[in-house]
Amino acid sequence: TCVKEIIEAMPDVDILVTPGGGGGLLSGTCLGAHYFKPGLKVYAGEPEGAADAVLSIQSGKVEKAPFVNTIADGLLTTLSERTLEIIQAHVSDILLVSEDEIKAALRLVYERMKIIIEPSCAVPLAAVLKNADLFKRCF
């Protein structure tokens, strides 16, 4: 229901960015976007140190990251066959971010909002900041 609620609160939204991880939130976001607002683009942020989703998209089958090294440990789960299928059909792109970019996003949220968030939650923001040209309408 989160996609439905976002669309109701912001009817003009045209892009959503979520963390990658095991693909549950990402695939659910994709399906919700496809159902409630066809044409709504969904992107995923993924740590470079746990890039199994990017590898899986490239190979067309569920892959494990060749190495795992990230502060965003909430995203260490692997895609399933079903989530990969949904992501292949509906995700606009998976955007890789470095550890430094994740830490910079964490710092930005703390400095601006005075809240501490989990590193995995900072990954989508890091992806947006790194790819500002892709999201220029958002700034």
What are these regions (language model features)?
Residues 1-139:
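PLP-dependent amino-acid enzyme catalytic core
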